[in-house]
């Protein structure tokens, strides 16, 4: 029998494993649904293709466990960053495809009683973010959480902000799933501020001179990753789960 590498957090309310009657009982108490949105995308030779997915899933499991809110099955694919190098295993959606898929999923869930959707992603590529932020429902509230919109620069040594397969991604993965990280394969590669701005907007590919990562993954540690993850979890808890959403 195959055993999953990472078991869900104890007490996480996973829709995938919940019968319809139990879903109805949970909905009567809390009509929210947490939805992790990942990518199947290279982040350099030292990280797994599911790096962004693993980070988002772990946070969603922890939040579901803490606040007893249902957590949807993971959306495993997103809008990838274009790269000048072909990475074996990469699989991406177009922005409009991801947008339409999320519209369909949320419409279906809204029809059976969910009244708020919390989309959580660890991928700050602008076309990917656009697909999430423009999702439309009939009446239900949609809240999009970009984990890397939370400032982490003071916890890093070689960068002032999150990049791609960098010190932040690698540190968090060293904390959450160290067995999946190959630090001996990590390679640093920096962009200028203008190049980074264009890259985030989807106007610049990861250069062929890069092994696939942007930033300084060589400086990553599990200790930094723990501090980053705990900050992210605290900020998301405070802003999304402990503070009432403003009336629209």
Model regions: which residues?
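Extended, histidine- and acidic-residue-enriched regions that form the cofactor-binding/catalytic faces
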Residues: 1-248
């Amino acid at each position: 029998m195959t055993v999953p590498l990472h078991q869900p957090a104890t007490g996480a309310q996973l829709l995938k494993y919940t019968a319809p009657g139990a879903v109805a009982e949970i909905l009567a108490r809390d009509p929210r649904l947490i939805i992790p949105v990942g990518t199947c995308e290279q982040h350099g030779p030292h990280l797994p293709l599911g790096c962004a997915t693993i980070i988002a899933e772990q946070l969603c499991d922890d939040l579901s466990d803490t606040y007893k809110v249902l957590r949807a099955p993971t959306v495993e694919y997103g809008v990838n960053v274009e790269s000048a190098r072909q990475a074996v295993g990469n699989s991406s959606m177009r922005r409009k495809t991801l947008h339409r898929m999320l519209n369909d999923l949320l419409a279906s869930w809204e029809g059976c009683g969910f009244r708020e959707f919390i989309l959580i992603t660890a991928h700050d590529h602008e076309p990917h973010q656009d697909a999430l932020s423009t999702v439309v429902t009939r009446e239900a509230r949609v809240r999009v959480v970009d984990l890397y919109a939370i400032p982490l620069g003071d916890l890093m040594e070689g960068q002032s902000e999150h990049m791609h397969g960098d010190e932040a991604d690698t540190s968090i993965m060293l904390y959450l799933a160290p067995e999946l990280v190959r630090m001996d394969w990590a390679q640093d590669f920096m962009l200028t501020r203008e190049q980074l701005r264009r890259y985030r907007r989807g106007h610049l590919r990861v250069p062929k001179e890069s092994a696939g990562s942007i930033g300084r993954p060589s400086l990553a540690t599990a200790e930094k990753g723990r501090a980053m993850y705990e900050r992210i979890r605290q900020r998301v808890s405070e802003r999304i789960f402990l503070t009432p959403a403003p009336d629209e």
